[in-house]
UniProtKB/Swiss-Prot annotation:
<dbReference type="InterPro" id="IPR005749">
    <property type="entry name" value="Ribosomal_uL15_bac-type"/>
</dbReference>
<dbReference type="GO" id="GO:0019843">
    <property type="term" value="F:rRNA binding"/>
</dbReference>
<dbReference type="GO" id="GO:0003735">
    <property type="term" value="F:structural constituent of ribosome"/>
</dbReference>
<comment type="similarity">
    <text>Belongs to the universal ribosomal protein uL15 family.</text>
</comment>
<dbReference type="Pfam" id="PF00828">
    <property type="entry name" value="Ribosomal_L27A"/>
</dbReference>
<comment type="function">
    <text>Binds to the 23S rRNA.</text>
</comment>
<dbReference type="InterPro" id="IPR036227">
    <property type="entry name" value="Ribosomal_uL15/eL18_sf"/>
</dbReference>
<keyword id="KW-0694">RNA-binding</keyword>
<dbReference type="InterPro" id="IPR030878">
    <property type="entry name" value="Ribosomal_uL15"/>
</dbReference>
<dbReference type="GO" id="GO:0006412">
    <property type="term" value="P:translation"/>
</dbReference>
<dbReference type="GO" id="GO:0015934">
    <property type="term" value="C:large ribosomal subunit"/>
</dbReference>
<keyword id="KW-0687">Ribonucleoprotein</keyword>
<protein>
    <recommendedName>
        <fullName>Large ribosomal subunit protein uL15</fullName>
    </recommendedName>
</protein>
<keyword id="KW-0689">Ribosomal protein</keyword>
<keyword id="KW-0699">rRNA-binding</keyword>
<dbReference type="InterPro" id="IPR021131">
    <property type="entry name" value="Ribosomal_uL15/eL18"/>
</dbReference>
<comment type="subunit">
    <text>Part of the 50S ribosomal subunit.</text>
</comment>
Length: 150
């Protein structure tokens, strides 16, 4: 194999036509966009426009409602806590605060609401500050009572 044979079998890519460089070049003046009109302007794509046909978002029925007052919890699994304890990232397992969880990247902010879920298992008793706990996490884990912030 020689350097001049490297691209021998590959199809050649057609050179793109340069736009807007005079009437003689074939794509001058309006640069293949036609005359005036919405599609001749820059940034022409109209989101959701389907050529006059009823757009999909108006054809489909409206569904659902999202409550502004609904509590949204950040989820922390007890298995993830045990992994951090095993890796010695959590030294004092008797007092795992929201500040520590935020520092370790488990939750975005110490102000976040935290719900403990039962995926995984704990090996020792742990004290965690939380707002809610699942039934499975409460039954299977060794969570201590009284540290909830709510």
């Amino acid at each position: 194999m020689k350097l001049n044979e490297l691209f021998a079998g590959l199809p050649k890519r057609r050179r793109l036509k340069v736009l807007g460089r005079g009437l003689g070049c074939g794509k001058g003046k309006t640069s293949g966009r036609g005359h005036k009109g919405q599609k001749a302007r820059s940034g022409c794509a109209v989101n959701g426009f389907e050529g006059g046909q009823q757009p999909i978002f108006t054809r489909l029925p409206k569904r659902g409602f999202r409550s502004m007052s609904r509590a949204r919890y950040e989820i922390v699994n007890i298995g993830a806590l045990q992994r951090l304890i095993s890796e010695k990232k959590i030294v004092d397992a008797s007092n795992i605060s929201k500040e520590l969880m935020a520092e370790l990247g488990m939750i975005p902010s110490p102000m976040s609401k935290v719900k403990i879920l039962g995926k995984g298992a704990l090996k020792a008793k742990v004290g965690i500050s939380y707002d809610a706990v699942s039934k499975a996490a409460w039954e299977e884990s060794l969570l201590t009572e009284g540290l909830s912030d709510s």
